[in-house]
From Swiss-Prot:
PANTHER family: 3-DEHYDROQUINATE DEHYDRATASE (PTHR43699:SF1). One of its GO terms (biological process) is chorismate biosynthetic process. Its EC number is 4.2.1.10. This is 3-dehydroquinate dehydratase. It catalyses: 3-dehydroquinate = 3-dehydroshikimate + H2O. Involved in the third step of the chorismate pathway, which leads to the biosynthesis of aromatic amino acids. Catalyzes the cis-dehydration of 3-dehydroquinate (DHQ) and introduces the first double bond of the aromatic ring to yield 3-dehydroshikimate. NCBIfam families: aroD. Homodimer. It comes from Listeria innocua serovar 6a (strain ATCC BAA-680 / CLIP 11262). 3-dehydroquinate binds at E46, W47, R48, R82, R212, S231, Q235. Keywords: Amino-acid biosynthesis, Aromatic amino acid biosynthesis, Lyase, Schiff base. Disulfide bonds: none annotated. One of its GO terms (molecular function) is 3-dehydroquinate dehydratase activity. Belongs to the type-I 3-dehydroquinase family.
């Protein structure tokens, strides 16, 4: 499997990397969050820009990113606009979604960009090309907040993401039962054994919490923890998360 190196973080080796989302609505709130995250043991910061009140103003988005980067100069930043259809805060046109992501990928200030799988393939490929030209890694994602698809479907989506050029394919699904969590873990194990790229998977909510902890066992390269406000159901406090990941890593 290829390792994916972003600044001082290597995905695809050792314990899953910890990503903590920033969900501030204003520049002031984001700066406060960034200062707080500076004190926390994490690997990646995800800027969930769909929470930002001025997200439709690209000049203001870039200015906010400058402020975040000034506070976190060495921390890998994952830039994510989560669309409403995948559980995000805001519905925007496809045209704006791609303009936003392509513009920010070209700033030199982000390290990874989230690209949702279920869009026009030509648009997705263009965004991947723009990202890679600017040395930005692509987290290609899909989120199902209603259910856990069949194992074959989870495997198919992750495999498709890699085929399109994702550096880090990602899927998050909602369990209705413990069996659904096993389905996600089984799919993760199957894909990680044959994939060329590290993958990121999770089963959400309380039922799925084991999937956020057991990535090193089943093959998920990153997990999401909460420092203040969780951006998705089931995220664990980042300090507790590091403790458990370290505990499991020592057994390997």
């Amino acid at each position: 499997m290829n390792k994916v190196v972003v600044k001082n973080v290597t995905f695809g080796e050792g314990a899953p990397k910890i990503c903590v989302p920033m969900v501030g609505k204003t520049v002031a709130a984001l700066k406060e969050e960034a200062e707080m995250l500076k004190t926390i043991d994490l690997d990646v910061v995800e800027w969930r820009v769909d929470f930002f009140e001025d997200v439709k103003d690209l000049v203001k988005v870039k200015a906010a990113l400058d402020e975040i980067r000034a506070i976190l100069p060495e921390t890998p930043i994952l830039f994510t606009f989560r669309s409403a259809k995948e559980g995000g805060e805001l519905a925007v046109s496809d045209e704006f979604y791609f303009e936003l992501n392509e513009t920010l990928a070209g700033t030199g200030k982000i390290d990874l960009v989230d690209v949702e799988l279920f869009n026009e393939e030509a648009d997705v490929l263009r965004l991947i090309e723009t990202a890679h030209k600017n040395n930005v890694k692509v987290v290609m994602s899909n989120h199902d907040f209603d259910k856990t698809p069949a194992k074959e479907e989870i495997v198919s989506r992750l495999t498709r993401m890699e085929a399109l050029g994702a550096d880090l394919p990602k899927i998050a699904v909602m369990p209705k039962s413990a069996g659904d969590v096993l389905t996600l873990l089984d799919a993760t194990n199957t894909v990680s054994e044959k994939a060329n790229q590290p993958i990121i998977t999770m089963s959400m909510a309380g039922t799925g919490v084991i999937s956020r902890l057991a990535g090193e066992v089943f093959g998920s390269a990153m997990t999401f923890g909460a420092a203040k406000k969780a951006s998705a159901p089931g995220q664990i406090d980042v300090n507790e998360l590091r403790h458990v990941l370290d505990l499991l890593h020592k057994q390997f």
